[in-house]
């Protein structure tokens, strides 16, 4: 899906890691939620409340998912899932564009 129709955008940005990670929340009529954001190069550790599907629209990074011993390379358009109530790490190599879907 290249665009979203009939949504509400929350104006206030979600800002993490001193502005190196930012996103905007997109609310859908069915009650679901996504965030659209940008990751600057750097190393990040994130926690989840809900299950998340991270769709990398463009970028270059390594991702270490919960329970995994090794890092997974993500280049270009790829996605990965993160369980609820867990943590994952990202080592972003170049500016990356993402869409995160929250599965409650």
Swiss-Prot record:
GO CC terms: cytosol
Reaction equation(s) it catalyzes: a purine D-ribonucleoside + phosphate = a purine nucleobase + alpha-D-ribose 1-phosphate; adenosine + phosphate = alpha-D-ribose 1-phosphate + adenine; cytidine + phosphate = cytosine + alpha-D-ribose 1-phosphate; guanosine + phosphate = alpha-D-ribose 1-phosphate + guanine
Record-stated family: Belongs to the nucleoside phosphorylase PpnP family.
SUPFAM superfamilies reported in the protein's UniProt record: RmlC-like cupins
Designated name of the protein: Pyrimidine/purine nucleoside phosphorylase
EC supergroup of this enzyme: transferase
Recorded superkingdom: Bacteria
Keyword line: Glycosyltransferase, Transferase
Gene Ontology molecular function, alphabetical: guanosine phosphorylase activity; purine-nucleoside phosphorylase activity; thymidine phosphorylase activity; uridine phosphorylase activity
Record InterPro entries: Ppnp, RmlC-like_jellyroll, RmlC_Cupin_sf
Source lineage: Bacteria, Pseudomonadati, Spirochaetota, Spirochaetia, Leptospirales
CDD domains: cupin_PpnP-like (cd20296)
Enzyme Commission number(s) of this protein: 2.4.2.1, 2.4.2.2
Function, as annotated: Catalyzes the phosphorolysis of diverse nucleosides, yielding D-ribose 1-phosphate and the respective free bases. Can use uridine, adenosine, guanosine, cytidine, thymidine, inosine and xanthosine as substrates. Also catalyzes the reverse reactions.
Pfam families: Ppnp (PF06865)
